């Protein structure tokens, strides 16, 4: 099917679908042909999808008419795919148009000034709405008094007309008809079902098989032989890019982490045996979306490569009632279970939800594991007592490719509810404390942390399934030594510590006397919301866009930090520096939330906006984010000697204390309302 559209080795495709079988079919098809794919989570906004399509240089996107989530229809094509392709255009293409048009007008120095102002105001974007550029141009023109009204009007008209002609690089949109919802039809759209039917007909003709029933009646071995003769797998070098998956960084645009055909697949398959002692008779249920690395690694690739059964379930594990995930375990006799801790936190804090779970038999489980976010001993204790006796804790991230810390099932340790996890046999790790840094932030002196001392977790040796690079430098993709954006990859993960090999993910940890590690969240400016990593700079950029859209915006500047949340782990909280001391009203807050939702998706929307008169600022002009976060979590503020304005700390503390008090009242009212109405329903 993919080959029939002219796709070949090295071409890129984007998958934006719910957790359905077609998502897996197309993933496996791309792997077979050496086509490089990038999965995009269905909860992201059209803007985020547009950015990733363009950054990937994709030719084809595969989507669905809709999906289901908590008894609601999620219109993938109408809400995400079509707006991503129609409403957004590549920034560089838009700037090229602007430069060309300016050169056609005899405005020389004024034109160059206009261009620089527009380019600066849109800096950091990958794709933009056409109105973003016209608004930026309008703002720049209002500052240039040398141009008369006629020239200004003609310039803006020419730009608007030319911008309308710019489009994305996508040639075809494959649409999977899943829910049957009506969608808009475009010339670029092709039906997945029609493409598959045509491929079946070509295959039957090639194999001289008259009917579809005859094709389906072939034995597994005969079908494999037939398929391999009809569509041979494309041989690729072991380090050829298999897929890249985007993750948020503390600064800059999201990073497309590249995983390879050889090392990644071999590594994650091996973890199934080492961690779970898996056999081909096991049934594995992973609560994950293919748009995240957990879905790629342990929902799809590792179980299928190992030869065991993977259970796929669309929607929330807690809907229509909290016992849904347990009912799936009972019904399908699941033996291996893997999920983040967020959903279990929601269950254990609600007696009614606990009762829902207890209705089902989960005794077939041999081993379960947490992933994606730090786990507390209390959550692990509940999991061990209520779900599976062997409920272990595993640690890894998108960059790691697969689990790097865990506790091999039935292995060398008596399992305790202490949230500890151990490096796998091929992982060498330590916790470090920085003692001296240079001006660039690189640690030039450090020591290994004492037992129980909190520091930064560092992996000190390479291993096969670690990400190879960051997606980039695509012009050299077919060169023998292609390394993607190697400079950015090295800068992001390998330059924190001076000296020997050191891979730094950006997480705090403690090492115990028994060699086990406990994880304590991020050490950089990334927020982990229910296992979804979001860069604070991404959220800040979306909020600051309000200044471009609304000339009367009250937003002067913004700093976003993560606040602890009982169920989600962390939630974004935005500190706003108001223009001329202005406060935000309800309309402002609603508008800013809507803006972040449309730009970055629902998980990025701050829970609250707190107005302050200034941010904690160092003498070098940098905002001290850690001070804001320390106040939020009632943590020791540490060394504040570098602050230029230490007096602002007390004001911010008072603001946060008022916010906490109001939040407690709101949560109490919400709980009472839930018990009065929702439980009754």
Task: Enumerate the predicted regions with their spans.
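ATP-dependent adenylate-forming carboxylate-activation enzymes
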Residues: 17-18, 38-54, 66-68, 72-75, ...
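Conserved C-terminal "lid"/linker of ANL adenylate-forming enzymes
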Residues: 559-565, 572-577, 590-681
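Conserved ATP/PPi-binding loop(s) of AMP-dependent carboxylate-activating enzymes
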Residues: 437-495, 516, 532-535, 636-637
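AMP-binding/adenylate-forming catalytic core of the ANL superfamily
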Residues: 15, 41-65, 330, 337, ...
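Conserved AMP-binding/adenylation subdomain of ANL enzymes
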Residues: 34, 260-283, 287-335, 349-351, ...
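Structural core segment of the AMP-binding/adenylate-forming
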Residues: 4-5, 28, 32-215, 340-341
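Gly/Ser/Thr-rich phosphate-binding loop
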Residues: 190, 195, 203, 207-213, ...
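Conserved pre-ATP/AMP-binding loop-to-beta segment of ANL
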Residues: 166-181, 187-246, 253, 263, ...
């Amino acid at each position: 099917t993919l080959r029939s559209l002219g796709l070949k080795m090295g071409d890129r495709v984007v998958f934006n679908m719910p957790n359905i079988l077609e998502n897996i079919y197309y993933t496996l098809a791309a792997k077979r042909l050496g086509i490089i794919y990038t999965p995009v989570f269905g909860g992201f906004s059209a803007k985020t999808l547009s950015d990733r399509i363009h950054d990937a240089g994709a030719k084809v996107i595969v989507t669905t008419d809709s999906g289901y989530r908590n008894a609601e229809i999620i219109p993938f094509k109408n809400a995400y795919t079509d707006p991503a392709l129609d409403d957004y255009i590549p920034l560089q293409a838009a700037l090229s148009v602007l430069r060309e048009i300016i050169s056609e007008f005899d405005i020389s120095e004024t034109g160059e000034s206009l261009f620089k102002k527009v380019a600066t105001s849109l800096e950091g974007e990958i794709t933009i709405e056409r109105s973003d550029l016209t608004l930026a141009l309008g703002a720049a023109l209002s500052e240039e008094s040398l141009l008369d009204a006629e020239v200004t009007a003609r310039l803006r008209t020419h730009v608007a007309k030319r911008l309308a002609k710019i489009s994305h690089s996508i040639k075809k949109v494959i649409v999977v008809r899943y829910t049957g919802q009506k969608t808009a039809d475009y010339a670029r759209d092709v039906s997945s079902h029609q493409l598959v039917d045509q491929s079946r007909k070509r295959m039957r003709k090639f194999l001289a098989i008259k009917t579809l029933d005859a094709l389906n009646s072939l034995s597994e071995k005969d079908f494999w032989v037939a398929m391999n003769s009809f569509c041979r797998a494309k041989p690729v070098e072991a380090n050829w890019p298999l897929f890249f998956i985007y993750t948020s960084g503390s600064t800059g645009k999201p990073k497309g982490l590249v995983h390879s055909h050889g090392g990644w697949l071999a590594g994650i398959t091996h973890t199934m045996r080492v961690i779970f002692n898996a056999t081909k008779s096991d049934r594995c249920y992973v609560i994950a979306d293919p748009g995240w690395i957990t879905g790629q690694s342990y929902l799809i690739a590792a179980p299928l490569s190992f030869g065991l059964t993977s259970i796929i379930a669309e929607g929330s594990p807690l809907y229509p009632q909290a016992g849904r995930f347990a009912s799936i375990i009972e019904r399908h006799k699941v033996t291996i279970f893997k999920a983040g801790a967020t959903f279990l936190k929601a269950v254990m804090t609600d007696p009614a939800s606990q009762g829902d779970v207890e209705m089902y038999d989960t005794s077939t489980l041999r081993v379960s594991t947490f992933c994606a976010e730090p786990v507390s001993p209390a959550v692990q204790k509940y999991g061990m007592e209520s779900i599976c006796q062997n409920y272990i804790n595993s640690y890894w991230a998108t960059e790691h490719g697969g689990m790097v810390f865990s506790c091999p099932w039935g292995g060398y340790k008596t399992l305790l509810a202490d949230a500890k996890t151990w490096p796998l046999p091929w992982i060498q790790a330590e916790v470090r404390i920085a003692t001296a840094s240079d001006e660039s932030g690189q640690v030039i002196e450090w020591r290994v942390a004492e037992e129980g001392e909190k520091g930064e977790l560092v992996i000190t040796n390479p291993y096969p399934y670690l990400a190879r690079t960051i997606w980039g430098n695509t012009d050299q993709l077919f060169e023998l030594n292609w390394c993607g954006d190697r400079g950015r990859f090295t800068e992001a993960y390998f330059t924190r510590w001076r000296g020997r090999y050191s891979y730094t993910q950006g997480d705090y940890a403690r090492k115990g006397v028994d060699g086990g590690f406990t994880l304590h969240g991020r050490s950089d400016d990334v927020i982990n919301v229910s296992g979804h990593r979001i860069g604070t700079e991404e959220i800040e950029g979306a909020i600051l866009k309000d200044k471009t859209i609304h000339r009367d915006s009250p937003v002067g500047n913004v700093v976003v930090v993560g606040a602890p949340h009982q169920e989600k782990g962390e939630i974004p909280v935005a500190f706003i520096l108001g223009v001329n001391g202005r406060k935000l009203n309800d309309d402002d807050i609603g508008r800013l939330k809507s803006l972040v939702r449309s730009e970055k998706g629902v998980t990025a929307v701050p829970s609250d906006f707190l107005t302050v008169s200034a941010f904690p600022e160092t003498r070098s002009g940098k905002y001290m984010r850690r001070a804001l976060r320390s106040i939020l979590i009632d943590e020791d503020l540490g060394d504040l000697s570098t602050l230029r304005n230490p007096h602002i700390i007390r004001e911010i503390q008072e603001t946060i204390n008022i916010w906490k008090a109001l939040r407690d009242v709101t949560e109490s009212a919400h709980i009472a309302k839930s018990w009065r109405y929702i439980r009754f329903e």
